[in-house]
Amino acid sequence: MASKGPTTSASTKSSSTGGTSGSSSSNGAGDNTNQDNTFECNICLDTAKDAVISLCGHLFCWPCLHQWLETRPNRQVCPVCKAGISRDKVIPLYGRGSTGQQDPREKTPPRPQGQRPEPENRGGFQGFGFGDGGFQMSFGIGAFPFGIFATAFNINDGRPPPAVPGTPQYVDEQFLSRLFLFVALVIMFWLLIA
C-alpha cells in the first residue's frame, strides 16, 4: 500500500513537468486496474456494491456486511481483523459516478422467505412400544447382557419416540408386541416340557 503512493505521485509529477506521455499513460492504465481491484468487498471478494468502510479500515458491500452482522447478533466483529463492528460503526462510501446518494445502511436487503421442509418419512416398523415408555430388550452371552448399560443410562438416542395411542402405527406396534410375546411364551412352554 505504501509503495502505491510514491508511484502515483511520481507519475503525476512526470506528466505535469512534461515527461514522456507514453510512460505516464501506461502507468495511468496500470493504476486504474489496480484502483478497481482495491475496491473489493472483503467478504464476497467481488467489486463492492453499496460500499461501506469500517472504522478499522476494511471495505465491504453493505448486503454482505448486513448478512454477516445478522447471522452473528451476539458477537459482532469485523470479518477481517475481529475488531468491534456494528451498523453504526461503518461509513458509507460515495464514489465518482454514483447515481444515488442514499445511505446504504438505510437499505437493508430483503429478508428471505421462510421454507418448511417436509418431515423425513422413515417408514417401516420403528421398534417395540410397551406403553409410552419405549421399552427396550437386549440379549447377550451368558451373564453379560450387552445392552444393559444403554438401557440403564438411556444412551440410545437414535430411537424415535413411541407412537401416539390411537394411530395406525400404535395399533400395528401393539399387535406385533403381543405376537412376539405369544411366540416367546410358546418357546418357553416348549422348553419346559422338552
Curated annotation (Swiss-Prot):
Chain spans, region Required for ubiquitin ligase activity and protection against ER stress-induced cell death: 31-82
Enzyme class: transferase
E.C. number(s) listed in UniProt: 2.3.2.27
UniProt-listed InterPro entries: RNF5/RNF185-like, Znf_C3HC4_RING-type, Znf_RING, Znf_RING/FYVE/PHD, Znf_RING_CS
Membrane topology: Multi-pass membrane protein
Residues in RING-type zinc fingers: 41-82
Transmembrane segments: 133-153, 174-194
Compartments where located: Mitochondrion outer membrane; Endoplasmic reticulum membrane
Region (Disordered) location: 1-32, 92-125
Keyword list, A-Z: Autophagy, Endoplasmic reticulum, Immunity, Innate immunity, Membrane, Metal-binding, Mitochondrion, Mitochondrion outer membrane, Transferase, Transmembrane, Transmembrane helix, Ubl conjugation pathway, Zinc, Zinc-finger
Pathway the protein takes part in: Protein modification; protein ubiquitination
Gene Ontology MF term list: ubiquitin protein ligase activity; ubiquitin-like protein conjugating enzyme binding; zinc ion binding
Domain notes: The RING-type zinc finger domain is responsible for E3 ubiquitin ligase activity.
Protein's job: E3 ubiquitin-protein ligase that regulates selective mitochondrial autophagy by mediating 'Lys-63'-linked polyubiquitination. Acts in the endoplasmic reticulum (ER)-associated degradation (ERAD) pathway, which targets misfolded proteins that accumulate in the endoplasmic reticulum (ER) for ubiquitination and subsequent proteasome-mediated degradation. Protects cells from ER stress-induced apoptosis. Responsible for the cotranslational ubiquitination and degradation of CFTR in the ERAD pathway.
Name of protein: E3 ubiquitin-protein ligase RNF185
